[in-house]
Structure formats: C-alpha cells, structure tokens
A protein has these predicted regions:
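Core catalytic alpha/beta fold that binds nucleotide/phospho-ligands
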Residues: 2, 14-155
C-alpha cells in the first residue's frame, strides 16, 4: 500500500508494520430508511428488539435522543458486516452475533460472537472496521474486514 511521504512520516514503526501486513478480506455497505426500523419497532416491539439487538445495544440506543436513528444505524452496520464477510445470513449467523459497541468518544466498533465469529476465524479476519452515519430519514454503514496471518487470533 502506498502512503504519501508526509503521511508515512507521522506513522510509528508499529503502524507502518500494521499497514504493510494488512490485507482486505471484504467490504460491505448498507443503507436503511429509519422509518422502516421505526415501523418494525412499533409493530413488533420488544420481540423485534430482542431478536435483532443485544441487551447492550438496546440499552445504548434506548438512551439516545434519536433512538430510531441509532437502531437503524446498527441494523445497517450488521448488514454491512455480513456483506464484508461475503456470507449473508447463512452458516449459522444470527443478528445478535454481530454487536456494535461505542468507545467513550462515540467511535463504533464490532464485537463478534457465535457463527459470525466462527466464519471470521475461517476467513482469517483479524478486525472488522465499521463506520456508521445517520440522519432523520436514513442510516448507512460501511464495514471493512481486515485480514490477518494464520497465526494471529481475533482477540
């Protein structure tokens, strides 16, 4: 991967090695209408939330001012992760196997469990990077599955 000289100068040796050894396994993107998610929540309530989102995600989204937008963003994130894996909803993967978490600054990250984690191990995915954005009408997400050498683990 080529980085312009001014960017390379800012990177530490560790970052340089990480960039050199990085491989892209897959990319995925998704967009969803927030109204669609709002209607699913209205129609199916707790059943829908419990089927699609983890307790941590429900707690986070429910505490937000625009909770529907946050639920829609997580929906789009889960879909984009599946696309980055290249599997769709096959191979024993469920909605709750993919969890969106946020650090103290709000940066989202992906935690994998169950079938999603197993598939990523088989694909030698070291990290699943995610970007989420939303407004009143739509939410979108972009996922990048980053590869690892066979000896590394996802932890």
């Amino acid at each position: 991967m080529f980085l312009p000289r001014f960017e390379r100068a800012k990177n530490s040796e560790w970052q340089e090695n990480r960039i050199r050894s990085m491989s892209i396994i897959g990319i995925g993107t998704d967009i969803v209408e927030c109204l669609r998610i709002a209607q699913m929540i209205e129609r199916h309530g707790e059943l829908f939330l419990a089927r699609v989102f983890t307790p941590r995600e429900i707690e986070y989204c429910s505490s937000r001012k625009a909770s529907t937008q946050h639920y829609a963003g997580r929906w789009a994130a889960k879909e984009s992760v599946l696309k980055a894996m290249g599997t769709g909803w096959t191979r024993g993967i469920s909605w709750r196997d993919i969890e969106v978490r946020n650090d103290e600054g709000g940066k989202p990250s992906i935690a994998l469990g169950g079938g999603a984690r197993e598939v990523c191990e088989q694909l030698h995915v070291a990290e699943m990077l995610i970007s989420i954005s939303h407004c009143r009408s739509h939410a979108t997400a972009y996922a990048l599955a980053v590869g690892r050498s066979r000896g590394d683990s996802m932890d």
